Amino acid sequence: MNEHILTLARENAPCYLYEYDIMKAQVETLRQTFPQYDLLYSIKANPFPPVVRALAALGLGADAASAPEVLLSRKCGMAKEDIFFSAAGKSDAALEAAWDEGEIIADSLGEVARIGALCRRKGQRRAIGVRMNPAFGMGGGVGTSSKFGINEEDLPQLKALLDDLPVTVEGIHVHLKSQNLDADVLGGCYRDSWALAKRVQAALDCEMRYVNFGSGVGVAYDAAFEQPMNLAHLRTYTDAIAADNDATWKARLMIETGRFPTAQAGTYWLRVVDKKFSRGKAYVIAENCMNGLQKPALAAMLRHELGGGTPAPYEPLFTSEWAFPIIAHGDESRTETVDIVGNLCCAADVLAEDFTGPELAVGDLIEVRNAGAYACTLTAQRFSSHQPPRELLVYGDGRVETE
């Protein structure tokens, strides 16, 4: 364990610590895998401003899911041509806020019409991207109904709409499923999305300037249970697409990083505040369990509902039972089995059940790994009005950023 990290945890728990050097190494891995592609960081995975600034400085753009994420990306140093605002149900106010700050990806025919109306009010003509709901599914099969994107079969309607609006389409976005670890499944989705881009270009008679392949790059949370994505094999798909692009459109090719840069760069630290025994069961009570990191409590809830079975992933709320390894920083000369619970006024506030590890005492620390993505940002922190955990970005040279 890095002694500097441990010292920061002692001083700041409950807290999230994000390690810059791990983030940088993850980004370098993606750059080596996809040298001809631009990388877009999914801001929703971890919008902590120092993290976004660091990734912007490493050259990443943004997949922004709201107008505030667009504005955060700009504030953190990203160029507006590197920010792609793609979300269902954008309000007119959201479109206005993001209008001059990033690229807009329309999610529906209705949104295209509203963008056209805004263009007319502003006396402008605008190029946009469109998110597509393709006729294919992830891993094969046919497409399904979805709240996201414009159905591929609705391209004739989109063409008719565009013909009457001061709006042109210059790119597409496809996102079917995140946290996939099968290179053939994800690579096949990229291949099919490239073919879809050609169909969209032909149907709309437009210039295709960019293709965002979406769907993120999956993370193996625990090597004992999951095999990491075979990035070398995935590259065979992306290299083939890039070669075809070089011979034809020379469009901008983009891959969403998803949680890959940050998930394994973060740890969550809790402090033990009490310990008790109740009718044969030992409880360790720590500050800010469910209201600091919610996903383990959701995993316990699903496990109980299934009667002990293994729940299927339901991203981003539930990834797997082994997604967040727990390390007890206690007395290693003694072992105990306990339930680690929080200080909220509800029984669902659980970090781990029947956890066996070093004996913990009041004041000891508990570490939760893989807490750099869909962790702090996904947690309901205001329940019971406790102080929320701190967040810190930690550099290898000892520097720390908190805001």
Predicted regions and their residues:
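A charged N-terminal "starter" segment
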Residues: 1-120, 124-126, 164, 168, ...
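Charged (often Lys/Glu-rich) extended helix/loop segments that serve as interaction or gating elements
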Residues: 2, 251-403
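Conserved active-site and cofactor/substrate-binding residues in soluble primary-metabolism enzymes
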Residues: 18-25, 46, 50, 110, ...
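Conserved, mostly hydrophobic/aromatic
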Residues: 23, 44, 66, 98, ...
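Active-site-proximal loop/turn and secondary-structure-junction residues that shape catalytic pockets
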Residues: 45-47, 68, 89-91, 108-110, ...
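Structured core elements
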Residues: 61, 84, 105, 129-131, ...
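Solvent-exposed alpha-helices and their adjacent loops that cap or buttress functional pockets
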Residues: 77-78, 96-98, 120-123, 140, ...
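Active-site loop/helix belt of alpha/beta enzymes
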Residues: 135-275, 384-386
